[in-house]
């Protein structure tokens, strides 16, 4: 798949009643306090395997359904094509974004992840899980509903060890298939790997390593990276 545009933007959008939530969200997830700026250039996302530079787009709207109708028009196609991810912050019971997702996802680029962040504290995790079950296989994109509560910490994992809240959003960004990223040296990765590692962490590391392997254009470098990662992770299997 060859793209015509550099897909290196993440859009964070809220409707007007939740602008304060967006400000806190940007600080917590991206350590970004430049909320008065609509575009924050050259941000860095880094984990133990890679780092990538991206632009953070920050916006708000009066009504998300109206915004979606504008966003899916042909005129907005160039904007859609540069989006690595779109994060919508809203009250899902008021906005009911699931009613808009079908036409929205048809228009979105298939390599763009979409996260709907619910800030209504009356919404329980079971309700979020049901929405995720419905949409998990609807499109090839990553589409996920996430609960995020400012007034009280969100439990960061469920009974199965799956991440929730901000931790889950971080995981989505970590495992996104970035088209251009800088793979960290294997020696640095080796220093950061603990002596013991839980199974779910091993699985996440394998997923991240696989995506980074796919992003290395030079075949010999890719093979070398894969071999080194296999050697390191085999110590915990």
Curated annotation (Swiss-Prot):
It comes from the Eukaryota. Belongs to the IRC6 family. One of its GO terms (molecular function) is protein-macromolecule adaptor activity. Involved in gross chromosomal rearrangements (GCRs) and telomere healing. The gene is IRC6. GO terms for biological process: vesicle-mediated transport. This is Increased recombination centers protein 6. InterPro entries: Irc6 (IPR034627). Keywords: Chromosomal rearrangement. The keyword DNA-binding does not apply. The keyword Kinase does not apply.
């Amino acid at each position: 798949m060859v793209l015509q545009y550099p897909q290196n933007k993440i859009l964070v959008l809220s409707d007007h009643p939740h602008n304060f939530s967006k400000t806190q969200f940007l600080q917590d997830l991206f350590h970004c306090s430049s909320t008065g700026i609509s575009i924050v250039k050259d941000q860095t996302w880094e984990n133990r395997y890679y780092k990538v530079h991206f632009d953070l787009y920050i916006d708000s709207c009066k009504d998300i359904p109206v915004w979606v109708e504008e966003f899916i028009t042909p005129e907005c196609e160039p904007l859609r094509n540069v989006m690595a991810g779109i994060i919508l912050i809203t009250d899902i019971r008021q906005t009911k974004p699931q009613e808009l997702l079908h036409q929205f996802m048809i228009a979105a680029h298939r390599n763009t992840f979409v996260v709907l962040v619910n800030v209504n504290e009356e919404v329980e995790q079971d309700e979020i899980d049901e929405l995720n079950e419905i949409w998990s296989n609807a499109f090839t994109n990553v589409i996920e509903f996430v609960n995020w509560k400012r007034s009280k910490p969100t439990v960061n994992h469920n009974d199965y060890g799956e991440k929730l809240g901000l931790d889950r959003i971080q995981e989505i960004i970590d495992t996104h298939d970035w088209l251009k990223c800088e793979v960290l040296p294997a020696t640095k990765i080796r220093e950061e790997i603990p002596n013991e590692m839980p199974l779910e962490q091993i699985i996440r590391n394998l997923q991240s390593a696989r995506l980074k392997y796919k992003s290395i254009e030079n075949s010999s470098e890719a093979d070398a990276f894969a071999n080194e990662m296999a050697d390191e992770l085999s110590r915990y299997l």
